[in-house]
Amino acid sequence: MEVFESLKANLVGKNARIVLPEGEEPRILQAAKRIVKETDVTPVLLGNPDKIRIYLEIEGVLEGYEVIDPHSYAGFDEMVASLVERRKGKMAEEEARQILQDDVNYFGVMLVHLGIVDGMVSGAVHSTAATVRPALQIIKTRPNVKRTSGAFLMVRGTERYLFGDCAININPDAEGLAEIAINSAITAKMFGIDPKIAMLSYSTKGSGFGESVDKVVEATKIAHELRPDLEIDGELQFDAAFVPETAALKAPGSKVAGQANVFIFPGIEAGNIGYKMAERLGGFAAVGPVLQGLNKPVNDLSRGCNADDVYKLTLITAAQAVEQ
């Protein structure tokens, strides 16, 4: 089954509610129409109720969605008090009131925090920082998780792989890389991928030297100690991780080399370049970044996204909510 059809099937009857803070944006509205018509997910749109309803009614969507106007929200005072409490002395009441009136991402994240919705998708208009910052301040990371990270699902026909971290952590240390690998395994399983995780480097099993190689070797060791049940190997060059014939020469006996499907890059430079090369040269569709490690799911769109991207990331966010 195609990956998004599988996600849709798993969401039937789960009543997931995902807030889309940029509710008046045409790409968001087109995605909301499709979400209502094709899935069991309820989109919750922030914005002017009249504008949103008129648009969707013209498109033939009369029900199956919700609209919240942040400027007339009945629970606004409760939300302000909750934000002040959550920030623990770092935000006064007046500042909290102002930011919730002016910033739809903070408002949307608070809906997630309060359990009114199950997750949030934003970033069609806003920057990554504007989307992720309130999530880190309010939703925060899961217990025993020190950082969030960003993974891309790479799809071409029936092929599916996971690349991480391509979006958030610029130069993670060994502990950070190990954590990214473990969280990427969780994300991979959500997409029906049985994770075989390659810790990538310019070296395979001691063929090269340097601080970056040492970091990847140490990260692999830490990941093994934390999750001995996972199939993780490194350090591996990409050809050794992906090509069986090369793996037999460079990493004989490895349970991962030559058959990896989750690729952990040593830093954001390699990860960002790698996923874009696979997308542009290899013809893969890149879906994400999927944010990993948060207590509740919040995901960031590219400002160059289309309605299909919004639809897919909303399904992923709903799936994360159900999994958690």
Where do the language-model regions lie?
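Anion-binding alpha/beta catalytic cores of soluble intermediary-metabolism enzymes, centered on
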Residues: 1-257, 262-324
